[in-house]
Amino acid sequence: MGRKRLSDFGNARLACHDVSCLRGDRLLFTHLSFEVKAGEAVLITGANGIGKSSLLRLLAGFLKPFSGHIEKWGRVAFADEALAMDRHLPLEKALAYWAALDGVLGAEKEAMAVMALDILADSPVRLLSTGQRKRAVLARLLASQAAIWLLDEPANGLDAASVRALIEMIEHHRQKGGIILAVSHQGLDMADYKTLSLENFVANSGQSSGFFDLLDESHFS
């Protein structure tokens, strides 16, 4: 399905070229090649322990490929269960700190409003509930204004209203030409996303090197 794109992230792109991932003495996946373009969303699937989260960390630059290489056009933001904020700061100041590092002063205010956190602006981070902490993680992601979002279980800990806000946030990001790569056991109700199954790239699976055709999945009504 076509979508109108704004110019914000129109040049965003991410590509893996024959990438293999080694954790400890275990080769998780190998010969993984794919490309994601501006406005696209990919859901990474596979059994527990197959390397879904490790792939996101490779794409974020936290890990190095055992072989192959990764190319990224556009800034990257990564979100998982870790809050990574000063527990003693008020929430707004904690988010403002990261927004300043990303060079987007003031972006935290809109991000807090989107995730319904503005009422908690003066609350210390340490007092946030589990659900509020997860919304703070997503607010930090939004405030970063990065083109490429890497989401590891983004819906965990969210109530139904917050999940809807997350999906709206994702779709707005894509309309601007942003990229989404996500891992989610709960699934994400994203429009016309694609699926990348790591089952096809486990070591000794017989999958040949080369670009893998992502499977189109229509979940848009």
From Swiss-Prot:
Alphabetized GO MF terms: ABC-type heme transporter activity; ATP binding; ATP hydrolysis activity
Chain sites annotated for binding ATP: G46, A47, N48, G49, I50, G51, K52, S53
Gene3D superfamilies from the UniProt entry: P-loop containing nucleotide triphosphate hydrolases
Subcellular location(s) per record: Cell inner membrane
Entry keyword annotation includes Cell inner membrane: yes
Gene Ontology biological process: cytochrome complex assembly
Primary location recorded for the protein, binned into one broad class: membrane
Keyword hit for Translocase: yes
GO CC field: plasma membrane
SUPFAM superfamilies linked: P-loop containing nucleoside triphosphate hydrolases
NCBIfam families hit by this protein: ccmA (TIGR01189)
Subunit structure: The complex is composed of two ATP-binding proteins (CcmA) and two transmembrane proteins (CcmB).
Record protein name field: Cytochrome c biogenesis ATP-binding export protein CcmA
